[in-house]
Amino acid sequence: MRGPLEPDSADRPSLAILMREAPVLGDAETAEIKLSQATESLSPAERAALDGLLSRAPIARAVCLGMAEGSPFLLDLVRAEPTRLLRVLSDDPHAHLARLMADCAATAASGSEAEVMRALRRMRSEAALLIALADMGGAFDLIAVTAALTDVADAALRAALAFLLGDAARAGRLKPQDAADPAVGCGLAVIAMGKHGARELNYSSDIDLVVVFDREKAPLAEEVSAAPFFVKITQGLVRLLQERTADGYVLRVDLRLRPDPGSTAVALSTAAALDYYEREGATWERAAYIKARPVAGDLAVGRTFLAELSPFVWRRGLDFQAIADVHAMKREIHAFRGHDVVAVEGHNVKLGRGGIREVEFFVQTQQLIAGGRDPLLRNSRTLEALDALTAHRWIEPSVRDALAEAYVFLRRVEHRIQMVADAQTHSLPESRPAMEGFARFMGYPDRDAFAAALVTRLQTVQTHYANLFEDVAPPAVLDADLMFPPDENDRKTLAALSRLGFRDPAAASGMVRRWLSGGPRALKGESARAHLARIVPLMLEALARGGDPDGALAAADRFLSDLPGPQLLTALDRHPDLVRLLATILTAAPRLGETLARRPSLTDALLDPAFFDVLPDEAGLTAHLEHLLDTADTDEEQLDRARRFRQEQHVLIGVRIASGTLEAARAGEAYATLAEVIIRALHRRVWARFREAHGTIAGAQTAVLAMGKLGGREMTAGSDLDLIVLYDFDADADPTSDGARPLTGAQYFARFTQRLVTALTSLTNAGKLYDVDLRLRPSGRSGPVATRLASFATYQREEAWTWEHMALTRARVIAAEPEFGAKVRDVICAVMGQPRDPRRLAGDILDMRQSIAAEKGEGDMWNLKHAAGGQVDVEFLAQYLVLAHACAHPEIVDTATARVLATAARLGLLEPEDAHVLQRACRLYQNLTQVLRLAVDAHIVPADASPALRALLARAGEMPDFTTLDADLADTQAKVRTIFERILETAAE
């Protein structure tokens, strides 16, 4: 890339020279100061170069000042790296963009994940600045702007996918046709939809993708299954693009345009997708595919898929039913989102009356009507489609000209709105003073001049849109039909409920009327009922999407009945997306819904813009909790704050699982990390308070051992804490503490342990943290609650039963001073490495498994833990492998079952095929267990599970539907039991 101080090329004019228009400044002096401050870290030579460039290009200088005054987002990009501004202004814009994309692709081909993520984000930031400046300065017209934004998005997708596929190839899971370009022939196609597919992308909206794969074309390793492999690739793609880092994010990704997104995986086979569209495809889905374009991966697979889908999108005859269907979509947008009048302040230029969406619907409706018969109308780009409709006499040239001019104007307004703060919005400022500033940013002298231009375009679009639909009889609008007028037998209301799928519309109507009349305590006030009345239509539609509207409405009734007050209703009224999310929770995870009803303040966290970003890591959780505890006034307040912190984080993890934004398997680590952070914080504080009261013993140290699910980092929403507390002090020290209330030796540490357990388990005004189980300590219930390290080592070496050593395979130090923690780990490693008789070990494990089966039963396959071939079988096998082989292979010692199995396979201690079955079973059981613990209190009976829960389980199990999952689970358990018996019975002979 050319350096920032190199002169402009004579034959390739720089961006600064190409500019021909600029925003109008309101306060030039302040704008100068802002720009100067943002670029203050430039070197003297760089400063001179920038000043010289702007002095030679006064319009570019005016654009930069307009940026400083009107766009905090763009100014932040300059402030983060001022040479960025110099680079983009002094270079040919098209060549600069091409180099940015090429550099990113090169990093994806050879860099680490961290390097690729950084390269993607830096490309996006520099490209965003360049394109915005070119837009503001008139160097790019609308087509050039949207094409550049689309090119950058395409490049980011291709680079991220190339890295993921290359990573899979290096791991031996993918066998690419071309190692230098693993996307070629990979079998996976990424389809860009909407504006992205049409190369009409805007600045800040998300990109809509559909990801499909052809399992017959995928060059996968023999043991790799296509569906889970490509689902993981897709999830990785989303993470690489939208995870926020110190360098920002690249693109927000929306995968919800795929078939039946509530119950299908994020990547699905082309056969399954085609079958869905043939059976259930709706008009809106036909419209969505008008703009579809294969953008990354195996482009041949993508083109074949779209070709096979063509008969669904383009009906052979003239399809006038599309007019009513599209108009119904538009009415729902207006009804649900309140964009039904032309306005200026606060007007949504995309969804509002006369907005961009009406131009797009005007075009798409006529394409759907006639595109099946006339392929020349099948153009994905709005302006080109208007030309095609004119050429084929579907619209008059004057209509084309008016709509095209309005569309270009409105898209420029949309872009300028998004430039301000990189926000995913299409609405103009709400206040008149803010509109004055925005009008100048658009290049108008004042608000009134801009408003006149805007309203003219909005009215033009609205007129032509209305003319297209003037002969359409307006069917009952969902919103109006679900307003529940006084007549309790209102036929329109009952008909609307019936259309939504309610089996007993009269009962549903009665339930809603009870809410609106103030039945639940949270709805006693008139204001609360008004909030509810406004959200009822959207709530009913969202509840119905779960597949069991009547059951979902009953869950909503329980939720509203449990609400202690009306505050949540206000939030729901203001945030429609929260209504939809709550409906998902109530239908798929009622247990989580009960938690939210009891503590509605927890929903505040769901409104945080960062909610769907990456989960907070251990360092972030620790910093947050430490701040909360350090600023508490009393010990009691510390305990309350710890409990509220845990509840909030539990809800955030749970909602992420229910909404599909967090893999269920990763949730186990998230729950465990949260527990560790809390235990460490309280361990340190309880230890300090205890020593203040009782003094200390020379060399006194304590350690908390995590066992069980916490030790293996496989916790669920309902897991308790299996802990062991160990201690030590100087051998020659006085065993009596030196405080005002002295305690001696074992009593001292036992009392401390009791204090720690109380801090974790006691019920306060804010609830409780966890249940704690200390029964895995030496001698169980009969042993002391805290054990001296030397005694622990002796017991484990000389007295412990096989089951106790099995439990110890999952032991992990989570709270201790580093030196003492290392000593504890040494003891555990020594115990793990003891020579053992494999025959006796296998016999003990088989006996134990039979005892558990006799006590708990093993015939219910949905008792995932105890079923024959279930979790216990997998965990016992892993523990056998550790205890039998750690003496010769110490590297097999690990607290995580999945990693033990992987290491055993690598060492040749487990047949590859067995390892694959066991590892997949381990992942499947963990995924399903996460969902079940989140969703229900009692054991699941598949026939009784709601459709939404069955869909959530199928998604967690990476299966297309619950029936397939049920069969896969039975098959997996049978295979696991066969392996379990073969390995252990052979060893026991």
UniProtKB/Swiss-Prot annotation:
State one molecular function term (GO): [glutamate-ammonia-ligase] adenylyltransferase activity
Pfam families given for it? GlnD_UR_UTase, GlnE
UniProt keyword list: ATP-binding, Magnesium, Multifunctional enzyme, Nucleotide-binding, Nucleotidyltransferase, Transferase
The record's region (Adenylyl transferase) falls at 479-989
The highest taxon in the source lineage is Bacteria
Task: Give the CC-aspect GO terms.
Answer: cytosol
The UniProt catalytic activity note for this protein reads: [glutamine synthetase]-O(4)-(5'-adenylyl)-L-tyrosine + phosphate = [glutamine synthetase]-L-tyrosine + ADP; [glutamine synthetase]-L-tyrosine + ATP = [glutamine synthetase]-O(4)-(5'-adenylyl)-L-tyrosine + diphosphate
One GO biological process this protein is involved in is: regulation of glutamine family amino acid metabolic process
The cofactors named for this UniProt entry are: Mg(2+)
EC numbers: 2.7.7.89, 2.7.7.42
Region (Adenylyl removase) spans which residues? 1-473
Q: Which SUPFAM superfamilies match?
A: Nucleotidyltransferase, Nucleotidyltransferase substrate binding subunit/domain
Briefly state the protein's biological role: Involved in the regulation of glutamine synthetase GlnA, a key enzyme in the process to assimilate ammonia. When cellular nitrogen levels are high, the C-terminal adenylyl transferase (AT) inactivates GlnA by covalent transfer of an adenylyl group from ATP to specific tyrosine residue of GlnA, thus reducing its activity. Conversely, when nitrogen levels are low, the N-terminal adenylyl removase (AR) activates GlnA by removing the adenylyl group by phosphorolysis, increasing its activity.
Assigned protein family: Belongs to the GlnE family.
Q: What is this protein called?
A: Bifunctional glutamine synthetase adenylyltransferase/adenylyl-removing enzyme
Q: Which organism is it from?
A: Xanthobacter autotrophicus (strain ATCC BAA-1158 / Py2)
Task: Point out the gene that encodes the protein.
Answer: glnE
